Amino acid sequence: MPTAPLYYLPQGFSVHIVANTGLRVVDNFCTAEEAEYLINKAREHLTRSKVILNNKAVDDSGRTSSHSVAFHRHHQDSHVLPIIARGAMLAGVPMDHAEQIYVSRYSDGEFYHGHYDFSDSFMSDHRLCTILIYLNDLDENQGGETYFRELNVAVRPKAGRAVIWTNMNPDGSKHLETAHAALPPRGEGTEKWVIQLWFRPYQMHPIREKLASLQVAEGIPLKGDEELPPGTWIPSKTAA
């Protein structure tokens, strides 16, 4: 079970349930400083995002974003550790069950078509849980939502907001309703930045770095009610 203490949660951290969907939306999952750090760090090393096909990472016309590795076996950035710790606590698994972690950028018009986060490939099988964290804000005119077609839910990007869902049960049965798409941001110069955490039921990478210190920075403030486009629903009040 996770051993990371609760003080690694930003102040204002709150979990909301999207009724009858299995989705959780977490506001203030990361701080403004963490989001800015991840964007600036990733921008230096972006490459074309790929998909897994026949156990190989390949280019695909259905995924047009770019990404950068934020944390892996040979490069363990201590600034990313508190984010992994929070994710592990919510997923109910140890930190070292996280896969290699990416920051992704979607520029104007870029997208990722509908897909699952699990497959029969060894490179993406046994993904128990996904935590998708937005690193910047987009308004209703800028698009960029994460759209769950089967659930008829679209979540708008908001800096510090995370969406959490379970991909598979311990017995290996899959949650087919978790098919989702990254809708394109709209507008010249518009970008969407996210960081993805995928957790498995077994160790992926031993964590060599240590959590540095107590986290005292406040999370990104909540901003009251939101005006959402038709068909979009994001919880803003009912906490669980």
Q: How would you label these PLM feature ranges?
A:
Residues 1-164, 168-240:
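Fe(II)/2-oxoglutarate oxygenase catalytic core
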